[in-house]
Design a protein with these regions (language model features):
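DEDD superfamily 3′-5′ metal-dependent exonuclease/proofreading module
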Residues: 1-261
Length: 261
């Protein structure tokens, strides 16, 4: 069986038009989703094969306000998401339930985009929306950041993305650093999903295939997208290839027993 899913990551900044209308301007509107507007989003499409849980990157699409209006950006995201009515589909985010999906829903409401049926469907779907912040921080008082999780798995996403100030870059309409940050985040979330699935299944193949697939996909982009190309020669890739080969060759026990997860 082949399950199709996507990883979604959204960058948002303060919307001055909304902020001007509120009386409580504490902290300049920081960390208040209703005052934010979406400025960039990346969707990483992937497949997940059963019975072993092998993951494969199918592609990354990125949309931003340098090329699209916000109405067009939201419509493009809606088109790229898998159909929530498909019981085999899956949406993966990092803090998506509290931020990404909330911002997208609220902006769609503000812009009268009530017909975005995939966004609406995933907004209410809980079982197949995998928000990894709960996997990596469910027992701690403070949720782990995506940068912390990436460091746990062996990579510095802020180094890869050159740690831009998203709000300042968006105001200056300097979209390259925003896109770079967004794409690195969505790739890191995909790797985190691979490790989470490997733990859930008791088998290294989801993690190993996530690393190798992302590396192979990014290798072709290295000349024009070095921030993603860096994933192709990461020190963990050789280890992932060896673990994947051992599992496929029957040299490494698989705790999932070939059962779907």
């Amino acid at each position: 069986m082949r399950r199709v899913g996507c990883v979604l990551d959204v960058e948002s900044v303060l919307d001055p038009a909304v902020f001007d209308l509120v009386s409580n301007k504490t902290n300049g509107g920081y960390n208040r989703s209703t005052l934010q507007r979406s400025v960039c989003a990346s969707v990483l499409a992937f497949s997940e094969e059963e019975p072993h849980g092998d993951l494969e990157v199918l592609g990354i699409q990125t949309f931003h306000l340098g090329l699209l209006s916000e109405v067009e950006l939201l419509a493009a995201i809606d088109t790229c998401l898998p159909d929530p009515a498909d019981k085999g589909s899956r949406l993966v985010t990092y803090n998506g339930r509290a931020h990404d999906m909330v911002v997208l829903r609220q902006r769609a409401e503000r812009l009268w985009l009530f017909g975005l049926h995939r966004l609406r469907g995933w907004d209410v779907e809980r079982d197949r929306h995998v928000d990894l912040i709960y996997h990596y921080g469910q027992h701690s008082q403070r949720r782990a950041s995506l940068a912390d999780v990436a460091a746990l798995l062996g990579t510095s996403i802020r180094t890869l993305a050159c740690s831009p100030n998203i709000a300042a870059s968006a105001r200056a309409r300097d979209w390259d650093p925003v896109v770079r940050r967004n794409q690195v985040d969505v790739a890191a979330t995909f790797l985190a999903y691979g490790h989470a699935r490997a733990w859930q299944r008791g088998c290294a193949r989801p993690a190993a295939s996530a690393w190798t697939s992302l590396a192979d996909w990014a290798l072709a982009l290295k000349e024009r997208s070095s921030h993603l190309g860096d994933f192709s020669h990461h020190q963990r890739v050789d280890h992932a290839r060896a673990r994947l080969a051992a599992s496929m060759g029957g040299r490494e026990p698989c705790g999932c027993g070939g059962e779907g997860g």
